[in-house]
């Protein structure tokens, strides 16, 4: 049985004061929650501080990006080994903001995926379509293309102990969200697409939903059979809102 994962992506937000307060509040809010894995991905400059405050808790540490190189003359980059050394476990790659603002290709993201697997870290592979692609009926084709970049280079086995986050671009930070039925249909397509290569791998892969997940819509989303948690943006910056989402995932998957 798949174990749900709710992960907070802090994006370009944070300060030492915020890390101190938010991690303390999260520890308090989530101390009694079982049945759902939890992770947060602060900016890389605050990973060490967050790790210190999360010590002894069930909240895992994540990161928002990784470079394809392990070392060398690559100014400003952070390697998989550095993230592993500092204690990060879940690493976000392929986020639409990276694809859009940094022009990251499917092939480049597949390289990042490979580097993370080699380092025994867990990739959180973000995929999803734009509003125009959605309106043109291309959602499945876009998701398949983004997954195939990894499947074709690394094979289905690479998705063992891996997370996929379906994030429709039109729903990220917009207040819009796919309906539970819409999201479930895409999640099922993703799982079925991987199952064409390896059914057992497809069955165990965690598929999160992302895109304006909040306290109001979380519970209904998580009742869907192929939605295994969430990658949460803005709501992860408030302990009470994030905790509601985590608790909704834990309750939905236990019932």
Swiss-Prot record:
Biological process terms in GO annotation: gluconeogenesis; glyceraldehyde-3-phosphate biosynthetic process; glycerol catabolic process; glycolytic process
Binding site for substrate: 9-11, 173, 212, 233-234
Localisation: Cytoplasm
Main location class: cytoplasm
EC number(s) per entry: 5.3.1.1
Record organism: Sodalis glossinidius (strain morsitans)
HAMAP family on file: TIM_B
GO terms under cellular component: cytosol
Assembly behavior: Homodimer.
Pathway participation: Carbohydrate biosynthesis; gluconeogenesis; Carbohydrate degradation; glycolysis; D-glyceraldehyde 3-phosphate from glycerone phosphate: step 1/1
Keywords: Cytoplasm, Gluconeogenesis, Glycolysis, Isomerase
Physiological role: Involved in the gluconeogenesis. Catalyzes stereospecifically the conversion of dihydroxyacetone phosphate (DHAP) to D-glyceraldehyde-3-phosphate (G3P).
Catalytic activity, reaction form: D-glyceraldehyde 3-phosphate = dihydroxyacetone phosphate
PANTHER family: TRIOSEPHOSPHATE ISOMERASE
Name of this protein: Triosephosphate isomerase
Family assignment from sequence similarity: Belongs to the triosephosphate isomerase family.
Catalytic site: 95, 167
InterPro entries attached to this UniProt entry: Aldolase_TIM, TIM_sf, TrioseP_Isoase_bac/euk, Triosephosphate_isomerase, Triosephosphate_isomerase_AS
One Gene Ontology MF term: triose-phosphate isomerase activity
Enzyme class: isomerase
């Amino acid at each position: 049985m798949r174990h749900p994962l709710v992960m907070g992506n802090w994006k370009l937000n944070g300060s030492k004061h915020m890390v101190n307060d938010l991690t303390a509040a999260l520890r308090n809010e989530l101390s009694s929650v079982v049945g759902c894995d939890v992770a947060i991905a602060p900016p890389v400059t605050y990973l060490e501080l967050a790790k210190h405050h999360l010590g002894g808790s069930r909240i895992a540490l994540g990161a928002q990006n990784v470079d394809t190189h392990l070392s060398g003359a690559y100014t400003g980059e952070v390697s998989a080994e550095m993230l592993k050394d500092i204690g990060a476990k879940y690493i976000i790659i392929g986020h639409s903001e990276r694809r859009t603002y940094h022009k990251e290709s499917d092939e480049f993201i597949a390289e990042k995926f490979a580097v993370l697997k080699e380092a025994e870290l867990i990739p959180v592979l973000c995929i999803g379509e734009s509003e125009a692609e959605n309106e043109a009926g291309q959602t499945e084709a876009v998701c398949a293309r983004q997954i195939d970049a990894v499947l074709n280079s690394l094979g289905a086995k690479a998705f063992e102990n891996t997370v996929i986050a379906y994030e429709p671009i039109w729903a990220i930070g917009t207040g819009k969200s796919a309906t539970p039925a819409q999201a479930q249909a895409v999640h099922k397509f993703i799982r079925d697409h991987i199952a064409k290569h390896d059914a057992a791998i497809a069955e165990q892969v965690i598929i999160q939903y992302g895109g304006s997940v909040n306290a109001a819509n979380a519970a209904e989303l998580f009742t869907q059979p192929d939605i295994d948690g969430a990658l949460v943006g803005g709501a992860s910056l408030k302990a009470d809102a994030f905790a509601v989402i985590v608790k909704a995932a834990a309750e939905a998957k236990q019932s």
